């Protein structure tokens, strides 16, 4: 079984390397991320749950790790995130079920680490 905590750490490390090699692109993406996730009509918790659902449907392990971690940090409960998985499965079918189950593993891993 993969460690989502380790995946998140690895992506952060590789992101630093990418920033050195392509600073303009990463900077522009981070500005977009900051703007999209800024509180507005939707709070950060809600936006992270939306991002997690999309990450599951898009089958992106690194995105799942990042958005599970961020959603829990923003105050999402495990029960709320399971409902996010449910909606992602509805929209993405069998492949989303497979990645939704992986997301549940990430939820359980990060929740256990925070206790």
Residue ranges and their predicted role:
Residues 33-34, 51, 68-72, 85-86:
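Amphipathic alpha-helical segments within well-ordered protein domains
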Residues 82-108:
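C-terminal structural segments of small proteins and small subunits
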Residues 41-58, 82-84:
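Immediate flanking context of iron-sulfur cluster ligation sites
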Residues 1-46, 98-115:
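Acidic, glycine/proline-rich low-complexity segments that act as flexible tails and inter-domain linkers
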Residues 13-21, 51-55, 72:
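A ubiquitous short alpha-helical element
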Residues 55, 69, 73, 90, ...:
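Charged/polar positions on well-ordered alpha helices
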Residues 27, 66-78, 107:
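Iron-sulfur (Fe-S) cluster-binding segments and ferredoxin-like electron-carrier domains
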Residues 60-63:
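Short cysteine clusters
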């Amino acid at each position: 079984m993969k460690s989502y905590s380790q995946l998140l750490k690895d992506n952060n490390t590789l992101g630093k390397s990418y920033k050195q090699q392509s600073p303009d692109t990463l900077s522009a993406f981070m500005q977009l991320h900051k703007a999209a996730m800024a509180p507005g009509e939707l709070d950060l918790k809600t936006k992270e749950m939306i991002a997690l659902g999309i990450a599951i449907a898009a089958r992106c392990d690194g995105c799942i790790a990042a958005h599970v971690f961020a959603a829990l940090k923003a105050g999402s409960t495990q029960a709320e995130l399971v409902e996010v998985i449910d909606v992602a499965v509805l929209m993405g079918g069998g492949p989303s079920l497979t990645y939704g189950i992986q997301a549940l593993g990430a939820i359980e891993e990060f929740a256990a680490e925070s206790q």
